[in-house]
From Swiss-Prot:
GO molecular function: chromatin binding; chromatin DNA binding
Name by which UniProt lists this protein: NF-kappa-B-activating protein
Nucleus as UniProt keyword: yes
Region (Necessary for interaction with CIR1): 177-272
Keywords: Acetylation, Isopeptide bond, Notch signaling pathway, Nucleus, Phosphoprotein, Repressor, Transcription, Transcription regulation, Ubl conjugation
Family matches, as InterPro entries: NKAP, NKAP_C
Record region (Disordered): 1-309
Residues the record lists as Phosphothreonine modifications: T159
Family, as annotated: Belongs to the NKAP family.
Protein's organism: Rattus norvegicus (Rat)
Amino acid sequence: MAPVSGSRSPVREASGGKRRSSSRSPKSIKSSRSPRCRRSRSRSCSRFGDRNGLSHSLSGFSQSSRNQSYRSRSRSRSRERPSAQRSAPFASSSSSAYYGGYSRPYGGDKPWPSLLDKEREESLRQKRLSERERIGELGAPEVWGLSPKNPEPDSDEHTPVEDEEPKKSTTSASSSEDDKKKKRKSSRSKERAKKKRKKKSSKRKHKKYSEDSDSDSESDTDSSDEDSKRRAKKAKKKEKKKKRRGKKYKKKKSKKNRKESSDSSSKESQEEFLENPWKDRSKTEEPSDLIGPEAPKTLASQDDKPLNYGHALLPGEGAAMAEYVKAGKRIPRRGEIGLTSEEIASFECSGYVMSGSRHRRMEAVRLRKENQIYSADEKRALASFNQEERRKRENKILASFREMVYRKTKGKDDK
């Protein structure tokens, strides 16, 4: 062990340490400067040296030279020995082996190569994360290429016919608005012209009236009568004019409302056409609740009507059921004729059942029939009661009829 360690020079070991250190990443350099990392690495180096038959002095010296060589080559050469002295308290076994010539094994937690690998993996992972974030924000045009600023319209969504139709509709709407404005302007100008004419006519009338008053100044009584007549005529004319104006205004309003309604209906039809241009307009839409094609209309025959499962008792059925009730047996249903009630009960216990809807219907019929069963005395009492009621009704009707006949005949006799 000792002669092998003595044969190598510390300068060569330092140079070897420099070469090894040049292949490392910069993050591992910073982490190796901490005292804990130095401690663990010195321990791992000592173990590694023992396994390969090398002394602890070489490993300690190489570790110190590695730590210092990352700063600069010029500084590392001058500070090799002091750095070895600094690392001596943390790796006492390595320094004692170098100066004293004996070695003492010191157990470390983990070998330093595994820590370096972890640090490298961490740095690579951080780089990948940052690259992914950058690509997510900016994109990668060299891989995917830039997306088009104005995407081309899809052939299915935008057809040239559909693109032309909205243009036509907009032009038609604008033209209709212009026509409305022109009509309003023309109506206003007409009203102004009418007002001017009325003013002129009123002025002329005033002039004529003044001339007449000058000429007829001698006869005041005649002029006063004429004035009153004229005033009455003027008032009548004004009333007539007002009525005419009101009628004209109403007509104009009705015309405008009609035009607006027609315009709104045309706009709605245009919007509907834009929504679905392929819809058939010739056929009027009829609200139908049914969805899908209509079933062929066939005349309902008597065979198609639902079967009546016997609401009333058949002849002789009531007596047979009464016998079953007296015996305390189950009344057989109509669908179960041919079997005894005991057989039917055994079948039902073993799990044989009728179809659900038929079973329910039959059960209801059975219960109703059980309620319909009366004894002989009850039947007699009911028959007598019914006969009495019928006689009373008949007597009332006959009496009322006799009274009516008597009145009619009595009236004829009196005449």
